């Protein structure tokens, strides 16, 4: 019988920790939150000082029964949920259910799930931190009041199924405001003039761009002026000035949650939701050949750039051994966190610097490997010396017309030997330019003009939206991914490639919010509220006082809005699909499981269609296209476009790669250790998981 009971959130985490602690410890999972506010009602007693009415979550009965049974048999119970507000609240709820004293040393926390760290934490239990619990309760109650009080008004005035939220409504407003800027933008014509100068001994010409006249800046706004400049320039370009300077490029800080999400979006094409899903797997533990199950990275919800001394020391030793002493800074790099950062946890880094991405690759699926490699290389880069660059700027005179060319040469790569940051724009690095001296003469192969128009501001991507939300102090590391998922699921925003584009519904709801609940969509108000919630976490503000202060004015706004908002009818967006029953052009509708096509002549014509999403994978039975479908209950599956003539169907997503063993169709499956691909051909049995095992065996 186990003497000690350890309770965590997830089965994956339980499995990893259980292997570290040995037979005296029993590790069980609560499967997330066990108590919460009810979905069917407000769940907050406004009349009695905003007391939350918690209930045991549906479906947790069997899990809790098992936990109670194990708790009765244990001599000691440790609550080892995640080291953040949500984790602290889960521990508090578990303590309540198990009738434990929250002030007793029952809470253990660790920033990484490795053997040494977990064993150490068991020796250092503490009481539940009620400041963290209160901060979580305040956020939960505040979000419930905003959502459950405003959403019914939107249902009555716009349509059912809509929602408002303290962070989501601000995010939608920001996206709508940017779209309005784009719509209002008036492009201005301008012309670029580029001289391509012949370089002796090189096939590649040196490009110099027109700057102005006699060294003074001149913008070209019409073709006639461009033609006049080209005619005047001729083909002889004399070097009038050469400026060379050295500059340093500092290494980027190690990842916070926000910067990890941004960089994974830019460099890997991951959504914020996928990034957090994969990061959670890496944090909770993966089976690594020769090492057993272990956590690969530190805790993933953090706004800190701080690094533990021992981790920094290990990184510097690795850099010295791998790249040489020139890549080790004279003083270890220390990064300053942004204003308002909580700094409760370290930055996101590898748990063991000795486990390189290449060594871990055979044990990880493709997405896990890509994200681990990104985190690993970013961390190593953050501890390396700065890159040394030489920039050269050359001015040319062509009969009074001034042209300029600039280039950059790497003198010492520093941190760029392992890592370069992703970019939101497509601007290219300036290439090095040949050595030139004053009065050198170049001949122009040609001088070209190009008509351009000024561009509106870019739409937000997930990366740039997360960056802005963090800069403005809106939300916290744990809220960015679910916020973006929610505004897309509600139909307020849609993805177009990587861009976030507001729908007409998003514009309508934002207009209502701005006219009636201006504080809720005001960036400063929302950021100030975040600061107040942080004060609760620091024990400097009673949580109910913060809610009380907010609710008084909010209640008056609700009463006024209910009376003043008029019913809004949003015309349906017309598709290019014709209804085969009556010939009308079908329209897009939003249902509980997402968008679908419907005939506009309802109820006379009740034809509906699912929106076809192609997979670019051919059906193994008939060669038709496999498309994404949804069941009547909203569950995603994959079927042949020729249904009902073809019966092919799969709950798992088909992948483009053929089975290397038999050439059959492969599908992507999810297992305890993450995702893997498997062949569905009868009798084959090939999986990428199996191929990794084969590889391990051959290495042994």
Give the label of every model feature segment.
Residues 217-253:
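Metal- or metallocofactor-binding catalytic centers and their adjacent structured scaffolds
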Residues 259-272, 466-476:
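Short helix-coil junctions and helix-kink-helix linkers
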Residues 111-116, 257-258, 278-285, 291-301, ...:
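Short, conserved phosphate-binding/catalytic loop or strand-edge motifs used
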Residues 16-20, 66, 89-97, 117-121, ...:
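Alpha-helical scaffold elements adjacent to nucleotide-binding pockets in ATP/GTP-utilizing enzyme cores
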Residues 113-195, 245:
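C-terminal or mid-to-C-terminal helical accessory/interaction module adjacent to the motor/catalytic core
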Residues 1-140, 211-212, 220-224, 423, ...:
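Intrinsically disordered, low-complexity regulatory segments
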Residues 2-5, 16, 25, 151, ...:
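Basic, low-complexity terminal or inter-domain segments flanking catalytic cores
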Residues 139-149, 167, 197, 247-259, ...:
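Core structural elements
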